[in-house]
Design a protein with these regions (language model features):
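Catalytic binding pocket for nucleotide-activated donors in carbohydrate/polymer assembly enzymes
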Residues: 188-260, 268
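Donor-binding and catalytic core of enzymes assembling or modifying cell-surface/extracellular glycoconjugates
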Residues: 123, 129-215
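Hydrophobic beta-strand segments of well-ordered beta-sheets in folded domains
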Residues: 1-2, 61, 98-100, 135-138, ...
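Secretory-pathway luminal glycosyltransferase catalytic domains
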Residues: 2-133, 233-292
């Protein structure tokens, strides 16, 4: 059962195997389970780890969390194709043989500058892709047309909404991804691309501590590019996972995420005014202010 399924933006083109979405549940009558997380004070963010307790929750329990570890997908990752399918698999999109899709994330990410990938990441990734595939064209899908076109005015941005972005990634043979879960699902649900390049350390790309945020986002068969444009060896990625388990084993203080939330000026502004202001500023300063594309 998915709560608030009507708010799921991809419901028009994805078919999810879910129970009755019209049935109303009284939250106060349900149990609650939250995926275990910890706060990394050096990276200044929450780290979500695989939480084995999820396999032991009772019925009638609301499950909350990031839930991005592939260890939840048992017996294997292939199980997602049982529960999530395209409503129409007709490939009416670009010829993928010599095309690489760049999934550039802007929008709300610009509120959190540590999430925005530097231009050098994309330039290095395109250079790396050309080493693997000499004859290749690049196209962009993005949630922020103004931001992406400012970064790369000479690269074509594929127009459309969330469906077009998803489908172009679903059918692609080559992809360069941002640190966003949006790119994960079409890549994993579609025919596996020949090459996928993604940012090392994910949500804290190039951090000086050489830590992943979060280790749940380390996915098999992808190439992980560091801040210097180097593709990290699989053995180095595995060592990172091992080191993180050792580091986080020493964390032992539990609290709620609300404890870390701080109010800012925007919290005191009416939502309607915030949206209007954000839209205006995103047009004036596309590299610094984001407005989420609907």
């Amino acid at each position: 059962k998915l709560l608030n399924y009507d708010l799921f933006l991809a419901k028009d083109f994805l078919k999810l195997q879910v129970s009755d979405t019209k049935k109303v549940f009284e939250k106060k009558l349900l149990n609650s389970f939250k995926e275990k997380s910890l706060f990394d004070t050096k990276l200044n963010c929450f780290i979500h780890l695989f939480d084995e307790q999820i396999f032991h929750v009772d019925d009638n329990t609301i499950i909350e969390g990031i839930l991005q570890s592939e260890e939840y997908l048992r017996p294997s990752i292939d199980i997602i194709n049982k529960y999530i399918k395209l409503k129409d698999k007709k490939n009416s999109f670009l010829n993928r043989e010599n095309t690489c899709i760049l999934n550039i994330r802007g929008g709300e990410y610009k509120r959190h500058r540590e999430l925005i990938l530097p231009k050098s990441y994309w330039l290095n990734a395109m250079a790396n892709m050309k080493r693997f595939k000499k004859k290749i064209d690049f196209k962009i899908v993005t949630d922020d047309f103004a931001y992406a076109s400012t970064l790369f005015p000479s690269i074509e941005i594929i127009k459309g909404g969330i469906k077009e972005d998803f489908m172009n990634l679903f059918f692609c043979k080559y992809a360069i991804l941002s640190n966003s879960s949006f790119g994960y699902f079409p890549i994993k649900l579609g025919t596996p691309p020949d090459i996928v390049i993604a940012p090392n350390h994910w949500a804290r790309f190039g951090n000086k501590y050489e830590r992943w945020a979060s280790p749940s986002n380390i996915y098999k068969d992808w190439l992980w590019q560091d801040k210097n444009g180097e593709i990290r060896k699989p053995a180095e990625i595995e060592k990172s996972k091992f080191d993180l388990k050792r580091i986080y084993a020493s964390y032992n203080v539990y609290t709620t995420e609300d404890f870390f939330k701080k109010k800012t000026l925007k919290d005191f502004l009416p939502k309607k005014f915030r949206n209007l202001l954000k839209r205006l500023l995103s047009k004036l300063f596309p590299l610094y202010v984001g407005y989420l594309k609907k």
